[in-house]
Regions:
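Conserved acidic donor-binding segment of nucleotide-sugar-dependent glycosyltransferases
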Residues: 98-104, 114-118
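Non-transmembrane alpha-helical segments in soluble domains
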Residues: 9-13, 45, 112, 129, ...
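Glycine-centered loop/turn motifs
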Residues: 94-95
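A short, well-ordered alpha-helix in the C-terminal region of glycosyltransferases
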Residues: 113, 120-134, 144
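Short acidic active-site motifs
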Residues: 42-43, 106, 110
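Nucleotide-sugar donor-binding catalytic core of glycosyltransferases
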Residues: 1-63, 67, 79-88
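Short alpha-helix at the nucleotide-sugar/activated-sugar donor binding site of glycosyltransferases
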Residues: 72-75
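C-terminal alpha-helical cap of glycosyltransferases
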Residues: 138-153
Length: 153
């Protein structure tokens, strides 16, 4: 997974500006601006909201489920470009609420496209944000839990 991430970041850095926030010391990739880790709860939402593209590369050992990072990006109002995740499609619409890619080349093509099409990118980010507010608030999740409990009783 880390090799996949590094490969994607390297390919992306050849076609657009890339900044990586990381805890890893000694991370040096040509063409990638490496910044030290920022606080996930305080600073990361601001970074997500203000970045043109937020990349999610899910670890290969995570076989099912929606990555929390994907929800965090959309919840902050950021544009999400993620590897394919079938569970995400159960709640949201690909190309309307987020964008997915199938490999590094596809990721780069889509990153360039959405950097060049700012209005479309911002619309997708806004749709994703609205969808998170509709479906993933504490109120909504608690209601779902009570619905499950009621069915079991």
């Amino acid at each position: 997974s880390s090799m996949e991430r590094i490969g994607i970041l390297r390919e992306l850095s050849e076609v657009c500006d890339v900044t990586l926030y990381t805890q890893s010391s000694g991370c040096d990739m040509r063409g990638v601006r490496v910044r030290e880790y920022i606080d996930y709860e305080r600073d990361m939402p601001v970074m997500f909201a203000n970045s043109a593209i937020n990349l999610n590369v899910t670890l290969r050992n995570i076989r099912t489920g929606i990555p929390l990072r994907a929800l965090d990006i959309m919840g902050a109002g950021g544009f999400l470009l993620t590897n394919y995740c079938p569970e995400l499609n159960e709640y949201m619409t690909e190309g309307k609420d987020f964008v997915s890619y199938i490999d590094a080349g596809d990721c780069c093509e889509k990153a360039v496209y959405y950097i060049e099409h700012e209005a479309e990118r911002k619309k997708i980010a806004a749709n994703g944000h609205d969808r998170i507010l509709d479906m993933f608030t504490y109120e909504h999740q608690i209601k779902k839990m009570f619905d499950v409990i009621r069915k079991e009783l």
